[in-house]
């Protein structure tokens, strides 16, 4: 393992990671499974927690067929003021980034994501914020690997006290197909309104870690005015990474 830990140690660390997600889900009015679970319950298979595909048990898998919904109204500040909307409800975008990863067979390894690393840099690009300024986080959580990749890309230490979800995550809050992140953003908006002038980070990914997105939100306006960098301008950083050579007829020794 690239972290230098054993299979059992990694299994237990995944259990601890998602146990912390259940603590958030337990307190959520919208979580489909608002139940706090121990690391051991999550890490190891049981009658209630079958092994879906090694090393992931049921409690480590996204529940993405949940009957849920979320909605966000997007408009200009001028329009919102004209409609008489309370300014305390305003949420502003402070950063956004989207990247596309290389095909799976051409990536240099399977334990990190260059596209996610570039996204993590670009979502803060051109502003004064850093990860230290983020009070609330929702890392996309289809499986433990998605959270682990994001934690590495954004430089969040394993012992960082900030929860890595505001919903409880895909296995415990659940999601409506590919619309889970709408629930993440809506939940983030609630947190930011409760703590004005704080900042929240939401990430998303899809496919085989094929595409990534991130946004930073706050009740405060970004000054001076800002416009995002077109993703194609920094996508070239990823596209220019040399592909790993591929053969359909391997021979000789190999390590998996």
Name what the model sees in each region:
Residues 1-72, 76-79, 86-172, 190, ...:
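Conserved "HGTGT" condensation-loop signature of ketosynthase/thiolase-family condensing enzymes
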Residues 210:
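Gly/Pro-rich active-site capping loops and adjacent beta-alpha segments
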Residues 173-181, 192-197, 201-202:
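A conserved active-site cap/scaffold subdomain adjacent to cofactor or substrate pockets
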């Amino acid at each position: 393992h690239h972290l230098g830990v054993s299979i059992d140690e990694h299994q237990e660390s995944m259990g601890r990671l998602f146990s912390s997600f259940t603590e958030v889900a337990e307190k959520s009015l919208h979580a489909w499974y608002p139940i706090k679970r121990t690391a051991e319950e999550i890490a190891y298979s049981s009658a209630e927690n079958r092994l879906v595909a090694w090393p992931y048990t049921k409690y480590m898998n996204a529940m993405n067929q949940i009957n849920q919904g979320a909605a966000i109204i997007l408009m200009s500040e001028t329009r919102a003021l004209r409609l008489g909307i309370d300014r305390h409800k305003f949420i502003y975008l402070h950063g956004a980034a989207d990247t596309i990863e290389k095909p799976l067979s051409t990536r240099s390894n399977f334990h990190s994501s260059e596209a996610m690393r570039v996204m993590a840099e670009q979502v803060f690009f051109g502003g004064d914020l850093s990860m230290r300024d983020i009070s609330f986080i929702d890392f996309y959580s289809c499986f433990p690997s998605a959270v682990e990749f994001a934690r590495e890309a954004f430089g969040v230490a394993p012992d960082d006290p900030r929860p890595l979800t505001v919903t409880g995550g895909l296995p415990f809050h659940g999601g409506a197909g590919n619309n889970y992140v709408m629930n993440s953003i809506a939940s983030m908006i609630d947190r930011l309104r409760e703590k004005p002038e704080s900042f929240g980070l939401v990430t998303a990914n899809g496919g085989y870690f094929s595409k990534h997105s991130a946004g930073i939100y706050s009740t405060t306006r970004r000054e001076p005015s800002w416009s995002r960098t077109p993703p194609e301008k920094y996508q070239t950083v990823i596209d220019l990474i040399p592909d790993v050579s591929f053969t359909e007829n391997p021979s000789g020794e190999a390590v998996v």
